[in-house]
Structures are given as structure tokens and as C-alpha cells.
Curated annotation (Swiss-Prot):
UniProt-listed Enzyme Commission number(s): 3.4.21.-
Enzyme class: hydrolase
Keywords: Disulfide bond, Fibrinolytic toxin, Hemostasis impairing toxin, Hydrolase, Protease, Serine protease, Toxin
Family: Belongs to the peptidase S1 family.
Coiled coil: none
PANTHER family named among the record's database cross-references: ACROSIN-RELATED (PTHR24252), HYALIN (PTHR24252:SF7)
Disulfide cross-links: C29-C45, C127-C197, C158-C176, C187-C219
Biological processes annotated in GO: proteolysis
The name this protein goes by in its record: Fibrinolytic enzyme, isozyme C
Other notes: In L.rubellus there are at least three isozymes of fibrinolytic enzyme.
GO MF annotations, alphabetized: serine-type endopeptidase activity; toxin activity
Segments forming domain Peptidase S1: 1-242
Length: 242
């Protein structure tokens, strides 16, 4: 998260750190706990990765302190059958992680509440993005979970804001947030994690998908951050989680 602040411990109890093994384990993406055995993430976070090289940590606040957390390996995952790999705009960028061991719910570990239906576009609602993604133009990731409050914009506003960005297609199954001041947004490492919106309690209404970055890889928060719209996939999530 660019321009964010430290979250409080347990503030987003469904937030997971999705980690990849390559020599050692390290944070690669976010995810949201759906149940004790399933998690919601982005297809681009798992595309081409062997399941036994993926794990999630629940109840985590600080990457350097795993006390009170639970770790579960991933035994398989389901990517969306129409995931648009290779396109700049990652269509249907959603996936379910199937956990090899159950996570016990309670305290700072809770399942996410999803939207009830696809009736609310959340435009104009100030929501909260969260993640352990980059906080600046370097590859350095924060130790403490970051958050930032940003308003949701309409699909039309998001499309207009992306004019001139090569390959940036915005569809109705996207949901975008944009900081009017251009100071805060998602970045690499936030992918797969939640867009948290107030709606009779907090609901996870988006999965972090992509952002605009410079040729040097610096995320540009003056452009919208683009999320997969969870409410467009409620049936798919129900069919593929356990």
C-alpha cells in the first residue's frame, strides 16, 4: 500500500499473507479467509505456481512476529476458467485456495463476509485497502500490515481515468478505488488481498488485481487501483469453495 498507515492488530481478521517458497518462504500476495479451509485470492497470484509452494498465514499483523498466528499449506487451488492471463487487465482475476489443514476461527482470525448480492456498486463509498505490498518505489515490503481509506469510483470514472494507459481495460466485473489527491493506492504484494467496504459491517467487496506503474515498476497512485468485483462472482465462489 502506497501512502498508507499501520493497521491495528486484528483490524482485518480475514486478511491472510499468501507466501511463496523459493528457497525460503516469503510474502507474495494477500488473500482473504472464506472458511476454515478456503481462501479467496487472485488468479495471477497462483498462475503457474505449484500448490506445495504456496502457504497462507492467518492472524498475522507483523511479518517478523508470527506469535498467535496459524499457518496452512495449500493443497490445490481453483483459478477462474476464464482468467485472462497475458492481458494487461487480468480479466476474471479471482481464485480459491484450498487449504491442506483447517484454520481455527476466533479472535484475530475470522472468515470474510462477502456482499449479499450484485446490487451495490459501492461507488462513492469510502473503503479500506489493506496489505503487506510495497510502500514506495523499492522492492521493500512493510513489516506491519498497511491500510488506507480510498473512495470507490464508478466503472465509467475508472475507464476515463485509464485513458492513455496501454492495455488498461475496465469491465463491470472490476471495482476501482482512486485517491482524489493521488497519494495512496495499492502496489505489488497487495494483490489477492481484500477491498474492505462498510456495508452492514465490513464486507470484502474486491480482490486486489492490478495497478498502473511506471516503466521502472513504481506504482502510480494518481491512477485508480483495480480490484476484481467479488459480487460478480458469488455463484462461482460458492461453487468452488469448501
Amino acid at each position: 500500500v502506497i501512502g498508507g498507515t499501520n493497521a491495528s492488530p486484528g483490524e482485518f481478521p480475514w486478511q491472510l499473507s499468501q507466501q511463496r517458497q523459493s528457497g525460503s518462504w516469503s510474502h507474495s500476495c494477500g488473500a482473504s479467509l472464506l472458511s476454515s479451509t478456503s481462501a479467496l485470492s487472485a488468479s495471477h497470484c497462483v498462475d503457474g505456481v505449484l500448490p506445495n509452494n504456496i502457504r497462507v498465514i492467518a492472524g498475522l499483523w507483523q511479518q517478523s512476529d508470527t506469535s498467535g498466528t496459524q499457518t496452512a499449506n495449500v493443497d490445490s487451488y481453483t483459478m477462474h476458467e476464464n482468467y485472462g492471463a497475458g492481458t494487461a487487465s487480468y480479466s476474471n482475476d479471482i481464485a480459491i485456495l484450498h487449504l491442506a489443514t483447517s484454520i481455527s476461527l476466533g479472535g484475530n482470525i475470522q472468515a470474510a463476509v462477502l456482499p449479499a448480492n450484485n446490487n451495490n456498486d459501492y461507488a462513492g463509498t469510502t473503503c479500506v485497502i489493506s496489505g503487506w505490498g510495497r510502500t514506495d518505489g523499492t522492492n521493500n515490503l512493510p513489516d506491519i500490515l498497511q491500510k488506507s481509506s480510498i473512495p470507490v469510483i464508478t466503472t465509467a470514472q475508472c475507464t476515463a481515468a485509464m485513458v492513455g494507459v496501454g492495455g488498461a481495460n475496465i469491465w463491470d466485473n472490476h471495482i476501482c478505488v482512486q485517491d482524489p489527491a493521488g497519494n495512496t493506492g495499492a502496489c505489488n504484494g497487495d494483490s489477492g488481498g481484500p477491498l474492505n467496504c462498510p456495508d452492514g459491517g465490513t464486507r470484502v467487496v474486491g480482490v486486489t488485481s492490478w495497478v498502473v506503474s511506471s516503466g521502472l515498476g513504481t506504482c502510480l497512485p494518481d491512477y485508480p487501483s483495480v480490484y476484481t468485483r467479488v459480487s460478480a462472482y458469488l455463484g462461482w465462489i460458492g461453487d468452488n469453495s469448501r
